[in-house]
Amino acid sequence: MKISLGLIYGGKSAEHNVSLQTALAVTKALNTEKFDIHPIYITEEGEWLRGEKLTEPVSNVRMLQFEQNAKTFLPTSLNESMFPQPTSADEKIDVVFPLLHGPNGEDGTMQGLLELLNIPYVGNGVLASAAGMDKVMMKDVFAQAGLAQAKHLSFNKKDYEKATPDSLEQVEQVLGYPCFVKPANMGSSVGISKCRSKEELQTAFDLAFQYDRRVVVEEGVVGREIEIGVLGNDEPKCSVVGEIAPKTDFYDYKAKYEDGDTDLIIPASVSEDEYKTIHDMAIKAFKSLDGSGLVRADFFLTEKGEVLINEVNTMPGFTPFSMFPLLWKHTGVEYPELIEKLVSLAIERHQEKQTIKTTF
């Protein structure tokens, strides 16, 4: 019997276009003999639409003809039923795969909605998604878990605006140059800047605060950028490691999604000891967040052989040139099998939750 799989994509986020690419790639990879696909598109304004197909080129995705007045996954009013009853068995959704990146999708908000609706969904739960999306909170969790990481500082917008000169001086004294300024709640390198001077630093703060009210500043680390995939629930497994080798100054949005001006080296050349350290730190990071389903863990490997965790991505991209699927492909897990495994993990975790008592 086929599994009815709802693909939620788009979203009210600066990473909207990345989500479109991910959704198209996943749709092409799905085995239609095993899955009935139900695309659910969230516009940039936050409107939910359901359509029959997601087969258009990415540039035309917004032009898809959605059914007028079709039942949406989320009603426009809370006075309506939170999840309208399907008119036929074909409309029932068994599992949701939220292919959303960034705020309003990857940050625990969508996961919370799906929890309330009691629908199995692929990926991390509310806690891991929220903490994994917020770089400030994530770094606090990693510090508590004893994971080595680069020096960093965090600022909120109002405090920064009240004492801009002091904030800039603090960055210079504690971190120095070069440093990286990032919105706390954003991915795909959106809003990130590399700074080599006070002028660049102030401009970078202004840019980052356009995307979030909190900003994290990290010291520049001289080293290789190494990534590893984690897959599973309570007994997670790791993929081979890959290396990001950008031809530009750093691995920004353009290098990731537009011109492809970056080499992905898979598997990366690391020693057995280095791999074990990366593997163990990735598993520890996953468990410290109470992860489920998947994460991609990103590290720095310094010239001295020190491994520093940079961040985890709780819903890594599935574009044709995204690192996470490629890591698992080189580990022996092809696209269709990877997606099937994620759906299976979603059902497994959902069934486990159903055994928890909710009355006293």
UniProtKB/Swiss-Prot annotation:
Binding-site list for Mg(2+) 1: 298, 311
**What cofactor requirement does the entry state?**
Mg(2+); Mn(2+)
* E.C. numbers: 6.3.2.4
Asked whether the keyword Nucleotide-binding is assigned, the reply is: yes
Q: Where in the cell is it found?
A: Cytoplasm
- Where along this sequence does the record place binding of ATP? 172-227
- The stretch of residues making up the signal peptide is none
**Cofactor binding remark:** Binds 2 magnesium or manganese ions per subunit.
User: What's an example of a GO molecular-function annotation for this chain?
Assistant: metal ion binding
The record's Pfam families line, in alphabetical order, gives: Dala_Dala_lig_C (PF07478), Dala_Dala_lig_N (PF01820)
- Keywords in alphabetical order: ATP-binding, Cell shape, Cell wall biogenesis/degradation, Cytoplasm, Ligase, Magnesium, Manganese, Metal-binding, Nucleotide-binding, Peptidoglycan synthesis
Q: Which Gene3D superfamilies does the record cross-reference, listed alphabetically? A: 3.40.50.20, ATP-grasp fold, A domain, ATP-grasp fold, B domain
What region holds the ATP-grasp domain?
139-344
Q: At which positions is Mg(2+) 2 bound?
A: 311, 313
On whether Plastid is a keyword of this UniProt record, the answer is: no
Please name the GO terms of the biological process aspect recorded for this protein, alphabetically. cell wall organization; peptidoglycan biosynthetic process; regulation of cell shape
Q: Belongs to which family?
A: Belongs to the D-alanine--D-alanine ligase family.
Function comment: Cell wall formation.
Cite the NCBIfam families for this sequence.
D_ala_D_alaTIGR, PRK01372.1, PRK01966.1-2, PRK01966.1-4
The name this protein carries in UniProt is D-alanine--D-alanine ligase
Q: Origin organism of this chain? A: Bacillus pumilus (strain SAFR-032)
Q: What is the lineage of its organism?
A: Bacteria, Bacillati, Bacillota, Bacilli, Bacillales
- Tell me the gene name: ddl
